[in-house]
């Protein structure tokens, strides 16, 4: 059960779609049920629709509910928990969203905790998510980690001569750190670089407006491009031309765009959130603290200004590339988790 369009090209939806496809390839029958797009702040009609969707599922069936919806409908989950084998698929707990105010997070945590206590299994997309769920004191045996995969990809060719091509792959919203990135880049304006930002521009219009205004105020409009959501083929072209991937995110539970970059042997400058420090290590990029613009600017200055360093980090990225999990691996782990749900 997924709120909105599962073909949406953001991390959580990509995960859901790829794992569903992988399970089908393993012989599982997968039926995606679409919930109203108003989640995680559902209207009464959206909750009624979700109740009806669950009511229409055969008793005893396995049901995976995406975290974007689960924590916002604890009463709906509780009403069907004894009849269905419900698994929560937790990307980012709603109560852990850093863009929400503390009072809102407290209310959301209470609702999310009730929903999680009712399900039979909790599937998390990384150990960072697992840590964020510690507040709910879930039994250890009920939580299973199924990390995202990557697709085998050719090594990126890079930007060649001229400005260093930077690529940031992230929807523009409060948690992704675009303001910090622009500020950091303004501090290394004397370096030769260009930045392409690929990611949805409709999710958080207020933040998009702030970022565009900031780009103009800093005089970066000729060096920073926001292309919006790209097709897979167009995004692959930008990966192929990138010399560095930049991920300034304030909060990730894994870091799929970083993993996709490493799958192409592209070095990374990123913030230390989610699985990014583990993915990148010390060999494939430079990792800086979250919300530390000075450190981000320093890392960018080093990576942009030192071609030998970029070559060294690219060699490290190629080594990491060889050991990244695939989407087939993710599907196999999900199948094992769901099989255990069926015999519990």
Q: What do the PLM-derived regions correspond to, one by one?
A:
Residues 103-122:
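Membrane-proximal helix-turn-helix segments that form the acceptor-binding/catalytic region
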Residues 250:
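Aromatic "clamp/platform" in nucleotide-sugar-dependent glycosyltransferases that forms part
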Residues 282, 286-293, 302-308:
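Conserved acidic donor-binding segment of nucleotide-sugar-dependent glycosyltransferases
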Residues 128, 149:
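Carbohydrate-associated surface elements
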Residues 123, 157-176, 182-187, 196:
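Conserved donor-binding/catalytic core segment of Leloir-type glycosyltransferases
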Residues 194-212, 228:
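Glycosyltransferase donor-sugar binding loop
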Residues 229-230, 237-242:
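Short alpha-helical donor nucleotide-sugar binding micro-motif in glycosyltransferases
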Residues 267-270:
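Short hydrophobic beta-strand element within catalytic cores of glycosyltransferases
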């Amino acid at each position: 059960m997924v709120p909105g369009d599962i073909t949406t090209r953001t991390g959580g939806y990509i995960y859901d779609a790829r794992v569903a496809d992988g399970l089908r390839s393993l012989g599982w029958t997968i039926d995606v049920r679409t919930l109203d797009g108003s989640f995680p702040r559902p209207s009464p009609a959206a909750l009624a629709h979700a109740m009806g969707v669950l009511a229409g599922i055969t008793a005893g069936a396995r049901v995976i509910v995406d975290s974007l919806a689960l924590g916002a409908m604890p009463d709906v989950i509780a009403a069907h928990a004894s009849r269905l084998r419900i698994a929560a698929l937790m990307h980012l707990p709603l109560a852990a969203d850093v863009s929400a105010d503390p009072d809102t997070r407290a209310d959301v945590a209470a609702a999310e905790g009730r929903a999680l206590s009712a399900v039979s299994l909790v599937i998390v997309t990384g150990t960072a998510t697992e840590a964020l769920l510690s507040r709910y004191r879930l039994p250890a045996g009920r939580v299973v980690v199924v990390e995202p995969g990557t697709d085998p990809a050719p090594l990126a060719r890079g930007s060649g001569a001229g400005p260093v091509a930077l690529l940031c792959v992230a929807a523009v919203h409060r948690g992704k750190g675009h303001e910090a990135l622009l500020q950091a880049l303004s501090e290394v304006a004397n370096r030769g670089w260009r930045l392409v930002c690929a990611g949805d521009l409709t999710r958080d219009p207020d933040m998009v407006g702030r970022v565009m205004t900031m780009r103009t105020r800093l005089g970066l409009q000729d060096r920073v491009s926001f292309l919006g959501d790209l097709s897979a083929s167009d995004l692959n072209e930008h990966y192929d031309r990138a010399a560095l991937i930049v991920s300034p995110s304030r909060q990730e539970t894994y870091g799929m765009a970083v993993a996709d970059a490493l799958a192409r042997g592209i070095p990374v400058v990123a913030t230390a959130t989610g699985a990014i420090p583990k993915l990148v290590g010390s060999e494939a990029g430079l990792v800086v603290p979250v919300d530390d613009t000075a450190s981000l600017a320093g890392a960018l200055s080093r990576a942009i200004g030192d071609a030998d360093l970029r070559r060294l980090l690219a060699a490290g990225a190629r080594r990491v590339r060889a050991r990244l999990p695939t989407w087939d691996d993710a599907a196999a782990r999900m199948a094992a988790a769901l099989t255990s749900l069926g015999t519990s």
